[in-house]
Swiss-Prot record:
Amino acids binding (6S)-5,6,7,8-tetrahydrofolate: 110-113
CDD domains per record: FMT_core_Met-tRNA-FMT_N, Met_tRNA_FMT_C
EC code: 2.1.2.9
Gene Ontology molecular function terms on file: methionyl-tRNA formyltransferase activity
SUPFAM superfamilies: FMT C-terminal domain-like (SSF50486), Formyltransferase (SSF53328)
Name of protein: Methionyl-tRNA formyltransferase
Lineage: Bacteria, Bacillati, Bacillota, Bacilli, Bacillales
Species the sequence originates in: Bacillus mycoides (strain KBAB4) (Bacillus weihenstephanensis)
Keywords (A to Z) from UniProt: Protein biosynthesis, Transferase
Pfam families assigned: Formyl_trans_C, Formyl_trans_N
Entry function: Attaches a formyl group to the free amino group of methionyl-tRNA(fMet). The formyl group appears to play a dual role in the initiator identity of N-formylmethionyl-tRNA by promoting its recognition by IF2 and preventing the misappropriation of this tRNA by the elongation apparatus.
Amino acid sequence: MMKVVFMGTPDFSVPVLRRLIEDGYDVVGVVTQPDRPVGRKKVLTPTPVKVEAEKHGIPVVQPLKIREKDEYEKVLALEPDLIVTAAFGQIVPNEILEAPKYGCINVHASLLPELRGGAPIHYAIMEGKEKTGITIMYMVEKLDAGDILTQVEVEIEERETTGSLFDKLSEAGAHLLSKTVPLLIQGKLEPIKQSEAEVTFAYNIKREQEIIDWTKTGEEVYNHIRGLNPWPVAYTTLAGQVIKVWWGEKVSITEKAEPGTIVALEEDGFVVATGNETGVKITELQPSGKKRMSCSQFLRGTKPEIGTKLGENA
């Protein structure tokens, strides 16, 4: 039986690991990030992949830095025929990449060469794409730059969020891997080099990228809100207080107003001017230190005036 090592960390990776087990491969080890403190109480919490591996009695390796010799040698000691990675979260060294008979392959959540990096799902929505997908490719030391083995497209719906697309792509990745591994073993795949001219990047989201830029078009603001839902969540400021914006709707506005200005108060939300004639009606938000709520709930306690400017001192 072929021995496989799986490397992954978040929820996205779990269906991929599960599919390898269901397909009957001998998963001899799982490599995942170390347990981390989570929440206000800083409770030391295992990764979703570690939890899944332990359910199946699979040995778990948790390197702080996989590139260090004493760490990668633990992986080599498992003598895998194939290594599969999916959102592992560290650059894997050549010593590991060159060891398995069938190589090291990665399940990546974009149609490479577009959106290399750690946040391809966020960026696909933030950039207003109508489709994205899964790429399975050989791993190299350079970020997401290996030769492509297989791809599948996934449609992005008008009201898609990063959360819903994350789930769709995770399942699509597991399904594509199930079809790819047998073809790889049989030598039936022709690897395709990525076009460097078409490369774009989706680096991990930084705090300053979470701020809503109201000078952008209404469509761009709407995509920004969707792309950061449910994490890390877009935000703006109202009367100097941070407000997380969980959801908004695109609406046509006729009023001429500076971007970021509240131009209408409605029962289910307030309409904010943007950089074009498409405004955004905020319908779900979370004031600083409070729970997520509908905008209608918020408006029962707080009534901002028309003409109030959002995003000042953000």
